Amino acid sequence: MKQALLISFMLALLTATSAIAEKVRLAVTSSFHNSGLSDHIIPHIETDLEIDIQLIVVGTGQALKLGENGDVDAILVHSKPDEEEFVKKGFANHRREIMFNEYVIVGPSSDPAQISSAKNLLEAFSKLSKAMVNFVSRGDFSGTHKKEMEIWNKINFVPDDIGKKYISVGSAMGKAINIAVAFDAYILSDKATWLNHKNKGNLQIQFEGDRLLHNQYAFLPINPAAHAHVKDQTVEKIEGWLVSEKARNLINSYLIENVQVFSFNAR
């Protein structure tokens, strides 16, 4: 009888232990979350790998800082030069491209800067620089903010030169869009977050489709040589899932307003 009770107790203990999913901390860019894609795929990863993913939703700059400090086990971000520098410094062994979408310029329906007629992105930003219209910037060192600054640099323009019309908000994509709505302003946004955003006000997409608006997302596992406590084996499984056929199907099938907003391109 005692032996049977002992066996039952051990089985119950084993079951309870296995039911406690391993927790993994993943820093992700706010556009990945605000677009709704995280809610679309994270539950599948957790179920398939029997883990509990704790998402830390921040801009790319902050995500990289969390990775550098060893506060997360992996990051999913979208600023290739910074990612490559991150790997070069030894904070990650590699970067793995997973998917992409595109940026768009959103602005007032009347399009006072007339960027919708621009032949390319640089002409669109040149029109914005001359029109003295409100422009909201993320201003948070996120991937989107860095893309915006990259474009201003390409036309040799310092956006602060337009004074109070240039509104730097230091906020995530969703909050920045809300501020753009309030100021009837232009803003650079990833297309998925814009389409998924409920409060569009008087704004609409005014320019899209230029190759410079390509927005690549990559997965970077934190290097255990830099931070021995990271859960590198579990992170390796997450990376394997993210490049799987199931991931391809889920990412490519994610639609907003009947539009495919992300494209899988992992290799």
PLM features per residue range, with description:
Residues 4-15:
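Bacterial N-terminal signal peptides
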Residues 74-100:
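Acidic, polar ligand-binding/catalytic clefts
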Residues 105:
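Serine endopeptidase catalytic core focused on the charge-relay Asp
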Residues 53:
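Hydrophobic anchor at the start of a short beta-strand
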Residues 17-21:
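Sec/Tat signal peptide C-region and signal peptidase I cleavage site
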Residues 22-50, 61, 65-71, 80, ...:
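Exported/periplasmic ABC-transporter solute-binding proteins
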